[in-house]
UniProtKB/Swiss-Prot annotation:
Protein family per UniProt: Belongs to the FlgI family.
A GO cellular component annotation in the UniProt record: outer membrane-bounded periplasmic space
Protein function: Assembles around the rod to form the L-ring and probably protects the motor/basal body from shearing forces during rotation.
Organism expressing this protein natively: Geobacter sulfurreducens (strain ATCC 51573 / DSM 12127 / PCA)
Highest classification ranks of the organism: Bacteria, Pseudomonadati, Thermodesulfobacteriota, Desulfuromonadia, Geobacterales
Membrane-spanning residues: none
Predominant localisation class: periplasm
Name of this protein: Flagellar P-ring protein
Domain of life: Bacteria
Keywords: Bacterial flagellum, Periplasm, Signal
Annotated Pfam families: FlgI
Biological processes, Gene Ontology terms: bacterial-type flagellum-dependent cell motility
């Protein structure tokens, strides 16, 4: 074999192998360990410093909250004298990542509770954030970013984006650490993001081949149980790091997702169509009202001006083509055939539903 032929052969081999390699995905991208997850935090707080866009006097709880804050600072005020136009009551939420340490910071989201018009330019006062167990895990405080505005008067209002919600980057300080769920464990459970029998089996096989032992087993399609190998005893973190880097090829089910509100269509790679004929045509009905005014003759003593209705109706029907999709047709074949009929995305939604109803689509059809 001469050099040019060798080069061509090598290029062909690479082109054939690359698609298979591209399908391989790291285990850490399709699964996570049991217990290693974010935890939701929530708290109630006050935003101050608003330019007259806070809660109105009709909202009572901001007044009570502000009075309580002032009393804790040693300031006694009459609640009837408090005006809250520059103050807004808000709910503060955050996600506490796993293994967060004391002193680290997380982002917080702030949303108005009352009838405030805008939170732009406000500052969140110190707000404890609690978990589902009622314990305080973080404290939030800082200036709010809304990337919006809202200005108006009695007759007009100008608004950009959503001014009654915003975020504080790194606005919460972690005060309590979560327990280390991986410490002193001899067995780990890996939970798949998309449960699948084939994918779970491939993960277990890849782990067993890498560590030369039967340490991984599947009990169900959603998880893989892994025992810590003897060589990694006392080194759980190192074992997890080595295992997460392993690559497997997930097996995705054939699925078609339709969104009728937006006309969005997502078709999976494994979708197959049996032999079916598809015809498409549009019927357009146009009704137009063009009333005319009928007036009496000039200088006439009889008669009156009346409006005479006139209705025009136009019916047009586009000639529909007929496309035949052969058995085993792939998604590319389906798209090319339907494009040849000149269908729009919204028309395609109805066509795919009809193909599924005819029993010719070997895939799950999900409408959202």
């Amino acid at each position: 074999m001469d050099k040019p032929m060798k080069r061509i052969f090598v290029v062909l081999v690479i082109l054939l192998v690359l698609p298979q390699l591209a399908l391989a995905i790291r285990i850490k991208d399709i699964a996570s360990f049991d217990g290693v997850r974010d935890n939701q935090l929530i708290g109630y707080g006050l935003i101050v410093g608003l330019n007259g866009t806070g809660d109105s006097d009709q909202t009572k709880f901001p007044v009570q909250s502000l009075a309580n804050v002032l009393e804790r600072m040693g300031i006694t005020v009459n609640r009837d004298d408090i005006k809250v136009k520059n103050v807004a009551a808000v709910m503060v939420t955050a996600e506490l990542p796993p293994f967060s340490k004391q002193g680290t910071r997380v982002d917080v989201l702030v949303s108005s509770l009352g009838d405030a018009k805008s939170l732009a330019g406000g500052t969140l006062l110190m707000t404890p954030l609690k978990g589902a167990d009622g314990q305080v895990y973080a404290v939030a405080q800082g200036g709010l970013l809304t990337n919006s505005f809202s200005y108006g008067g009695q007759a007009a209002t100008a608004q950009k984006n959503h001014p009654t919600a915003g975020r504080i980057p790194n606005g919460a300080l972690v005060e309590r650490e979560l327990p280390n769920v991986l410490a002193d464990r001899s067995q780990l459970r890996l939970n798949l993001h998309q449960p699948d029998f084939t994918t779970a089996t491939r993960i277990a096989r890849a782990v067993n081949e890498q560590f030369k032992a039967g340490v991984a087993s599947c009990n169900d399609p959603g998880s893989v149980v892994i025992s810590l190998p003897d060589a990694y005893q006392g080194r759980v973190v190192e074992f997890v790091a080595d295992m997460e880097r392993l690559e497997v090829r997930p097996d995705n089910p054939a699925k078609v997702v339709l969104n009728e509100r937006t006309g969005t269509i997502v078709i999976g790679e494994n979708v197959r169509i049996d032999t079916v004929a598809v015809s498409h045509g549009n019927l357009t009905l146009l009704i137009k009202e063009t009333p005319r005014v009928s007036q009496p003759q000039p200088l006439s003593r009889t008669g009156e001006t009346v409006v005479v209705p006139r209705t025009g109706i136009k019916v047009s029907e586009e000639s529909g083509g007929l496309a035949v999709l052969r058995e085993g047709a792939s998604i590319g074949d389906v798209v090319r055939a339907l494009n040849a009929l000149g269908v729009t995305p919204r028309d395609l939604i109805g066509i795919l539903q009809a193909i599924k109803a005819a029993g010719a689509m070997q895939a799950e059809l999900s409408v959202i």
